């Protein structure tokens, strides 16, 4: 009998405790070091190493810089132009670091999750929705700080007839609150579905190719399709990080300008 590394397509999303901290006096279960913590730390280390390589590259030319530095500057310039186009005005620059950090973190987490048998951080609903809810709370506080009570005019579209105000306020409030969930849910759903698709198709092709020589040769056709899906998933990993950054910039604009 053949032993599989993964018995179920969902096994790759299970959070396992790697180091447990127990105390007879205090509940320290939340301080356990799990795969969740390990991969979060790994993502941060990869981002830090990337910046170190960009600074200490082979080239000492201060104008040209290393290849790592050129790549990072290209990404930063893309995010800068995107935030400038979304927010505009003279205040957009102060929010570029936030959007760039979110984009970089999600991009690296998505790419690390593409490695076979890895834990996908962005496929964890609790993790990603936790980020989106925290971001939504922060943007709401920012809107209240900048606009005071005028912030609540965001829930009343201009020109609304007085009898329709209660209904529209409820609709706008629900729409605004849904951002806290939809921002992270979109990313997690795309990542989860992509990983499940690759895992299920990979197991099916493996079982097909292990029957006999004929099915092994025939299985090369769907195997090529799986390689195409993997390439597509890499593209989706980059696109989803960019979409998250765009939506964050759009929500920032609403908090600043109330429209």
From Swiss-Prot:
Membrane topology category: Multi-pass membrane protein
Annotated localization: Mitochondrion inner membrane
InterPro entries for this protein: ATP_synth_F0_asu, ATP_synth_F0_asu_AS, ATP_synth_F0_asu_bact/mt, F0_ATP_A_sf
GO cellular component, one term: mitochondrial inner membrane
UniProt cross-references to CDD domains, sorted A to Z: ATP-synt_Fo_a_6
Pfam families per record: ATP-synt_A
Entry's transmembrane regions: 36-56, 95-115, 125-145, 164-206, 211-253
Propeptide, residue positions: 1-7
Claim: Transport is one of the keywords in the record: yes
Single annotated GO MF: proton-transporting ATP synthase activity, rotational mechanism
Annotated keywords: ATP synthesis, CF(0), Hydrogen ion transport, Ion transport, Membrane, Mitochondrion, Mitochondrion inner membrane, Transmembrane, Transmembrane helix, Transport
Primary residence: mitochondrion
Superkingdom, natural source: Eukaryota
Coiled coil stretches, renumbered: none
Subunit note: F-type ATP synthases have 2 components, the catalytic core F(1) and the membrane-embedded component F(0), linked together by a central stalk and a peripheral stalk. The central stalk, also called rotor shaft, is often seen as part of F(1). The peripheral stalk is seen as part of F(0). F(0) contains the membrane channel next to the rotor. F-type ATP synthases form dimers but each monomer functions independently in ATP generation.
Function text: Mitochondrial membrane ATP synthase (F(1)F(0) ATP synthase or Complex V) produces ATP from ADP in the presence of a proton gradient across the membrane which is generated by electron transport complexes of the respiratory chain. F-type ATP synthases consist of two structural domains, F(1) - containing the extramembraneous catalytic core, and F(0) - containing the membrane proton channel, linked together by a central stalk and a peripheral stalk.
Assigned protein family: Belongs to the ATPase A chain family.
Protein name: ATP synthase subunit a
Organism: Pichia angusta
């Amino acid at each position: 009998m053949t032993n599989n590394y993964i018995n179920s397509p969902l096994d790759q999303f299970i959070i396992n405790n790697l180091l447990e901290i127990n105390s007879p006096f205090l509940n320290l279960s939340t301080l356990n070091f799990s795969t969740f913590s390990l991969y979060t730390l790994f993502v941060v280390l990869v981002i830090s190493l990337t910046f170190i390589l960009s600074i200490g590259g082979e080239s000492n030319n201060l104008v040209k810089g290393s290849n790592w530095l050129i790549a990072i500057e290209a990404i930063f310039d893309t995010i800068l132009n995107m935030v400038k186009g979304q927010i505009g005005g003279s205040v957009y620059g102060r929010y570029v670091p936030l959007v760039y950090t979110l984009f970089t973190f999600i991009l690296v987490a998505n790419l690390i999750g593409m490695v076979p048998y890895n834990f996908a951080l962005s496929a964890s609903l609790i993790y990603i929705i936790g980020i989106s809810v925290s971001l939504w709370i922060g943007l709401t506080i920012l809107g209240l700080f900048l606009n005071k009570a005028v912030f609540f005019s965001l829930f009343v579209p201009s020109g609304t007839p007085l009898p329709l105000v209660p209904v529209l306020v409820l609709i706008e409030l629900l729409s605004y609150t849904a951002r806290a969930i939809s921002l992270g849910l979109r990313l997690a759903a795309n990542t989860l579905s992509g990983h499940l698709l690759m895992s299920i198709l990979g197991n099916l092709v493996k079982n097909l190719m292990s029957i006999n020589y004929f099915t092994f040769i025939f299985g090369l056709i769907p195997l090529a399709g799986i390689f195409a899906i993997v390439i597509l998933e890499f593209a989706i990993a980059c696109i989803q990080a960019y979409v998250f950054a765009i939506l964050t910039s759009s929500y920032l604009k609403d908090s600043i300008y109330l429209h």
